[in-house]
Design a protein with these regions (language model features):
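Extended, compositionally biased accessory segments flanking or bridging domains
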Residues: 1-64
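Charged, structured surface patches that assemble and position nucleic-acid processing machinery
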Residues: 37-39, 121-144
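Catalytic micro-motifs at enzyme active sites that drive phosphoryl/nucleotidyl and oxygen chemistry
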Residues: 41-43, 86-92, 118-125
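A broadly used, surface-exposed interaction patch
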Residues: 47-97
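Generic structural hydrophobic/aromatic packing signal, biased to beta-strands
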Residues: 55, 99-103, 136
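Short acidic, S/G/P-rich loop/turn micro-motifs used as interaction or catalytic elements
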Residues: 58-66, 106-115, 141-143
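"Short basic amphipathic alpha-helical interaction patches in structured regions
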Residues: 67-73, 113-127
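Elongated alpha-helical scaffolds
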Residues: 94-112
Length: 144
């Protein structure tokens, strides 16, 4: 089962639309120069709108600590100034402590041809809860 199928199976829905290279307007804090960055594979929101998962794929030789910190900064801006699609700022209150960075790593390339980051030497970021929780998942060519 791919990670995408897993999220959809449990009622999470995507906030990205790759066909139109579009993102929900309220999620603009995760864009770079108005575009979806290569490292952002997907954003999933739970059906109860109380959990947000950012599926991220760092570049092959990227420093994991700096990568996570950069995304924590984006998440903090979203928490302070953003809102969920079709909702107001109140929705952020229950979401604030339930934002997770899912960091993909592995050997080879993802289904879009982007090379995976090698297995990190240090998984200490997984214990960090400074702004968001982090989960490292090994993936493969089929995004499984």
């Amino acid at each position: 089962m791919t990670w995408m199928e897993c999220f959809e199976k449990y009622g999470y829905y995507s906030l990205l639309n790759y066909e139109t290279d579009d993102i929900e307007p309220e999620m603009e804090f995760f864009l770079e120069n108005g575009e979806i960055p290569n490292q952002l594979r997907e954003i999933y929101l739970s059906k109860y709108r109380d959990e947000l998962f950012l599926i991220l794929q760092p570049d092959r030789d990227e420093n994991v600590k700096k990568f996570c910190q950069r995304w924590d900064n984006n998440i903090m801006a979203f928490i302070k100034f953003g809102s969920l699609p079709d909702d107001n700022r109140e929705s952020i209150k229950k979401l604030r402590y339930n934002i997770v960075q899912v960091i993909l790593y592995g050997i080879g390339e993802n289904i879009n041809g982007v090379k995976y980051m090698n297995e990190p030497d240090d998984f200490s970021e997984e214990k960090s809860t400074s702004v968001s929780r982090k989960i490292f998942i090994k993936s493969n060519d089929a995004d499984e």
